Amino acid sequence: MNERGDYGDKADGWFAALDDSIAPVAADLRSLVRKAVPDATECIKWGTPNYEKDGAICAIRSGKEFVALQFGPIGTSLEDPDGLLEGTGKAMRHVKIRAKTDLKKQLFSSWIKQAATANLK
């Protein structure tokens, strides 16, 4: 049984509860994921919105002053020519976005699509 109580919930409440300083960034990321993989499912897992289609694609996490787009289990294999992805784990990587101007929509969309495609292999 899930001890968190939110596992599998819809993500609307999570987005609504965000601080006004980061909510617009999170909303843009959510929209980006939905456009990149329209048939991905969105639900709360581990307290944060997760996106799946035939396996994990990505998650959106929040910090005090940023929103992170997180990739695992293929985070380390994503093409990252600008070195934006952070993390030291075996597979997971994330990028922190502090303002809407930091959104690299084309690159992030590419990563999201790479993650979704990796699940088909």
Task: Please report, for each region that a protein language model flagged, where it lies by residue.
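Charge-dense, helix-prone N-terminal extensions
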Residues: M1-K121
